[in-house]
UniProtKB/Swiss-Prot annotation:
Lipid moiety-binding region (GPI-anchor amidated asparagine): N570
Xref: InterPro entries: Alkaline_phosphatase, Alkaline_phosphatase_AS, Alkaline_phosphatase_core_sf
Tissue: Ellipsoid body ring neurons in the adult brain and in the lower Malpighian tubule and ureter.
Name the UniProt record assigns to this protein: Alkaline phosphatase 4
Organism lineage: Eukaryota, Metazoa, Ecdysozoa, Arthropoda, Hexapoda
Organism, scientific name: Drosophila melanogaster (Fruit fly)
GO cellular component, as recorded: cell surface; extracellular region; extracellular space; plasma membrane; side of membrane
Keywords: Cell membrane, Disulfide bond, Glycoprotein, GPI-anchor, Hydrolase, Lipoprotein, Magnesium, Membrane, Metal-binding, Phosphoprotein, Signal, Transmembrane, Transmembrane helix, Zinc
Entry's family note: Belongs to the alkaline phosphatase family.
Annotated membrane topology: Lipid-anchor; GPI-anchor
Cysteines paired by S-S bonds: C539-C550
Spans through the membrane: 571-591
Propeptide intervals in chain numbering: 571-596
Example GO molecular function: metal ion binding
Amino acid sequence: MHCLVILGFLLGSLVAFSWAGVTTQPPPLIRTLSAGGDIGPQFDVGKTKEPEDAEFWHNVGLRQLEKTIKQAQRVKEDSYQKKARNIIIFIGDGMGISTISAGRIYKGQYLKHGYGEEETLVFDDFPNTGMAKTYNVDKQVPDSAGTATAIFSGSKTHYGAIGMDATRSKKNGQQGRVQSVMEWAQKEGKRTGVVTTTRITHATPAATYAHIYDRDWECDTEVPAESVGFHVDIARQLVENAPGNRFNVILGGGMSPMGILNASEVKTTIFEGPTETICTRGDNRNLPAEWLAHHANDTVPPALVHNRKDLLNVNVKKVDHLMGLFRNNHITYSIAREAGEPSLQEMTETALGILERGDESNGFVLLVEGGRIDQGHHMNYARAALHELYEFDLAIQAAVNNTDPDETLILVTADHSHAVTFNGYALRGADILGTANSHEKNDPMFYETISYANGPGYWDHLANDSRPQNSSNMWMPLKHFTAEERAAPTYRHLATVPRKDETHGGEDVAVFAYGPGSSLIRGVFEQNYLAYVMSYAGCLGPAKDFDDSCEDHKDGQKDRPLDKPNPKRNGATVVGASLIPILTAATAAILRGRGL
């Protein structure tokens, strides 16, 4: 008998060892020839992988939500059940960790608050933080269209896609559509709005209302012949279709895609790069006029404004629908803003005045984008980019000051990072935009604390057209540039690889959260999870019925005890039994009946 037991034990151990040996092996490596001729290892992926469409990412989002809630329940924490009447999501476009750190110092030095390093940004004090993985379905390093779709709709997608999942088609404008948090909010009777310093048709704001194959199709003239009749340009979608034509607030740049060019627009400072180009309409339509006509029968007439003075004169206690378009293209960088252009803070305060009215009971959802942080980095304009972050911080402070912390969930994050570095061994209090090693007198080459992996700054700093033997002679000494030149917003910091447009960075981005539901932000998660945080905390969209907390909140009941069974989640696992995210019966039911 003992021999049989020992034999069974040995056989069982052998099977277990063999199984473990198989399942713990890393994916097989294959070697491929890259376009540049270099051979590098890549993982063999995609052969048995399920399609990463909206249903796939819906599953991922709900699993992360369940995992996070279980973690809270294990430590008897119930703050995750608190519900938000209002939601504000701040997107610092391109605001990676290096930008946040450098921007914090820039703020302190700009305001002359000590050395700079000890300064704080408003969102530094938010109680909950996490890290979001930003990759697109088809790219390790993402773009703003795919990331914004993930944030607002809960589905990761292809690079360049807006409001559509990975099944999108150039010849089918309905295929792969996903709803955004703005659509979810409007179904619950909430007010909605979008504020940005970019064109209102640019990638991030467009992802709140548009569904289109390519982010560049902002005007009718940009839609290729093969897609005409299937896809409608982004600007038209804003005024023709919900949720865009039901927004209470639309503030930003982009008059040209909307069909109302200002021929006398002033440009005091000339910025360069692809971001400064803009499309024009070919159908001669005046879309703001059509927007006004759409709201002509409103109880209170809509307001259309084009300058700072008119914006600040809007009666926010009466106006229900406001559109403000302030430039043909993007609103000018804040460091060189033209007369008559509002600040992001002013636009945010005006938006909140309209959205958060005392006589309204359903609340609101608002996007505020600091969009030109990204565009400054693309041109290696470090000073312009960091000043945009400072303005972004002021807008966040305005939101904190003008909302109820017990009713408003505020999320601050980036859609992606940038290839910008904060390097060297600069002395404490050294100018963040200055040199890192000027105190080292024997160093043969001074270099700046902020530099870029790639971008147009390469050509500005290159000593000559050939690569010399001594790499230290490859770059022009910084003394070649005058102090005035280096202080200009158009000064480009050095980039080590030549590109007309600096690239994004692929590292995780930080998420800062404040208010009811903010405790759902913890750890590292896929970026699309943010949509599920807003859905669950705001009682809207696909996670509204994830458990009974929204019904309890609606009925004015006390939070459900942690050990109370949830009838909507039949078959749910015992609380705290496992931190491994699994799909419960209720979650599966939501997947079947509430697809994005």
